Amino acid sequence: QPANVDHLLTAHGLMMSEILTNAGRFRDKAVGIQKGKEVHHVAPPAHQVSGLMADLTQWLKQAKDHPLITSSVFHYEFEFIHPFSDGNGRMGRLWQTLILSQWHPLFLSLPLESVIKDHQQQYYQALEDADQQADSTPFIHFMLSVIAQTLALNAPVNATLNAPVNIEEMKTPEAILHLL
């Protein structure tokens, strides 16, 4: 269940057990994101992580927005909190896929992670833009674009094989729903 903190911790433990000594536990130290010597994001203090993650999963349980939006907001907030000492990006992307797959099982087989990797600089830029604006909208737009592109490349239900795809027109939840 994506709205269950214990499931999140268990998944992190399974994913990171060969890499981290504290896999499956929230971080107990300050962390930030640096590019060279420049700090781009300072995560909330470690003593706040447990409460922030409880708040985030509670929000997820009660979210009324479309799953495309909800999953993107969750992903952004998760990355902002940066709850683990390592593996936050992997976990955030995995959890977004999990949220989306509960809405539509097709997302279990879509390579969102691969498309994000192909656009890694834009991914980090969208996170940074959202941080600077104190608004998750830039990140939501980026993720909708990635989802639309992934669907267009892997599940072109209503298109012929040679039809051009306009990614800009596919960034809305309605356009993505049409692909499903």
Spans of model-derived segments:
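FIC/Doc superfamily catalytic core
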Residues: 1-180
